[in-house]
Amino acid sequence: MYSMMETELKPPAPQQPSGGNSNSASNNQNKNSPDRVKRPMNAFMVWSRGQRRKMAQENPKMHNSEISKRLGAEWKLLSEAEKRPFIDEAKRLRALHMKEHPDYKYRPRRKTKTLMKKDKYTLPGGLLAPGANAMTSGVGGSLGAGVNQRMDTYAHMNGWTNGGYGMMQEQLGYPQHPGLNAHNAPQMQPMHRYDVSALQYNSMSSSQTYMNGSPTYSMSYSQQGAPGMSLGSMGSVVKSESSSSPPVVTSSSHSRAPCQAGDLRDMISMYLPGAEVPESAAQSRLHMSQHYQSASVAGTGINGTLPLSHM
C-alpha cells in the first residue's frame, strides 16, 4: 500500500531519447525542413523522375531499389542523342540553382554504415596469407604435418598383429619405425631395439591361446643368454599360462636360436621350490622342466612352437 502511494506521488521521469533515435530524428527534420537546400538534379535524375513514376504504377509491389537498378540499366542503354535533352535540362537547373543559392556548398552526409561488405567477411587474425608464396608454404607445411602424422600411425601399427599391443609400444619406449629414419641408421645402432619378429610371433601365440583355450610355450630367445633376459621373459617359460606382454629382448641382433640346455636348467632351477615344499611336487616340476628341455633340443614345430603332446 505504501509503495503504491509512493509511486503515485512521484512525478514521472522524463524519457531521454537514445543516440540513434536522436540522430535519425535530426536527419528527418533536416530533410523536411524548408531551410534545407537540395542539390540540383543531374541528367539521370531528370530522366528517371518521369520513368520512376511510370514503372511504379505498372509494378506497384516492386521495391524502390529494384526500380532504381532497372532505370540505371536502361539509362546506360540510351544513346547520346536520346540523353541530350535531359543533359541540357540538367545544365539549366544547375544554373538556376547557382543563381538562387550563390553561397551553396555541397556537404555530404556522414554514412552510418561502419562495416563495408568485404571487411565483414574477412577472417580475423590474418588467417589468409597475404601472398601466393606464403599460401603455398602454409599448404605445404600442413600437408607435411599430415603425412608425418599418418606415418606415425602406421609406425604404431607395424609389427603388432593384435590391436591390444599398441599401447605396449609407447610404454616400452620403442623408437619410431626404421623406415622413417633410414638415413640415421648408423646413429641408431647403439640404441636397444626390440625384436619385431619375436614380438610378432608372441602376439600370434597369444591369439592362439585365446582361440584354443590352451596355453602355448614360446622359446624365442637370442644367443646372449640369461644376462640379457628380463624376469618377465624367464617367468613365461615356467608358468603354465602365457603372459599378457611379449618377452623383451634387449639384443640388437634379430637372429633367434634355441637356448642351450645348461642355461635353461639354471633358469628353471631359480624358480624351483626349496626344502619347505614336499619332494613329490619338486620332482614333478623337475620332470616337467626336463620334458620341455628335451622337446626343445629334439625338435620344434612350425615357427619354433612346441608340440602339445604333454597336454
Swiss-Prot record:
Swiss-Prot/TrEMBL domain comment:
The 9aaTAD motif is a transactivation domain present in a large number of yeast and animal transcription factors.
List this protein's GO terms for biological process.
brain development; negative regulation of transcription by RNA polymerase II; nervous system development; neuron differentiation; positive regulation of DNA-templated transcription; positive regulation of transcription by RNA polymerase II
Main location (coarse class): nucleus
Q: Does the keyword Cell membrane apply?
A: no
At which residues is the DNA-binding region annotated?
A: 37-105
Expression induction or repression: By bmp-antagonism. By chordin.
The protein's matches in PROSITE patterns, at most eight in alphabetical order, are given as:
HMG_BOX_2 (PS50118)
| MF terms in GO | DNA-binding transcription activator activity, RNA polymerase II-specific; RNA polymerase II cis-regulatory region sequence-specific DNA binding; sequence-specific DNA binding
Sequence ranges of Low complexity compositional bias: 18-32, 233-255
InterPro entries (UniProt xref):
HMG_box_dom, HMG_box_dom_sf, SOX_fam, SRY-related_HMG-box_TF-like
For the motif 9aaTAD, give the residue ranges. Answer: 266-274
Protein name, UniProt field: Transcription factor Sox-2
Q: In which tissues is it expressed?
A: By mid-gastrulation (stage 11), strongly expressed on the dorsal side of the embryo and by stage 13, expression marks the future neural plate including the neural crest. During neurulation, neural precursors showing expression converge to form the central nervous system and eye. At stage 23 (early tailbud), expressed in the primitive brain and optic vesicle, with expression high in the anterior neural tube. In the tail bud brain, expressed in several patches along the anterior-posterior axis in the telencephalon, midbrain-hindbrain boundary and hindbrain.
